[in-house]
């Protein structure tokens, strides 16, 4: 099996791990109520999706 010849420094390890960052979720604006919502999903504020009421929100 392959074995590393030298120990990886803390700096090299940190530089490699710097690419592991998370991406922010994309948000779109609901055309009915103007609140931010996840794209391709029902608005949790008003219950509309593609200009139709899908769920009733109290």
Curated annotation (Swiss-Prot):
Keywords from the named record: Ribonucleoprotein, Ribosomal protein
Tagged with keyword Ribosomal protein: yes
GO process terms (BP): translation
GO MF annotations in UniProt: structural constituent of ribosome
CC per GO annotation: large ribosomal subunit
Alphabetized Pfam families for the sequence: Ribosomal_L32p
UniProt-listed NCBIfam families: rpmF_bact (TIGR01031)
Family: Belongs to the bacterial ribosomal protein bL32 family.
Protein name: Large ribosomal subunit protein bL32
Protein species of origin: Sulfurihydrogenibium sp. (strain YO3AOP1)
Lineage: Bacteria, Pseudomonadati, Aquificota, Aquificia, Aquificales
Gene (UniProt): rpmF
């Amino acid at each position: 099996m392959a074995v590393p010849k030298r120990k990886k420094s803390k700096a090299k390890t940190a530089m490699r791990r710097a690419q592991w960052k998370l991406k922010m979720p994309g948000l779109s604006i609901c055309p009915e109520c103007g609140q931010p919502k996840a794209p391709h999903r029902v608005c949790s504020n008003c219950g509309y999706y593609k200009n139709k009421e899908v769920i009733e929100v109290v």
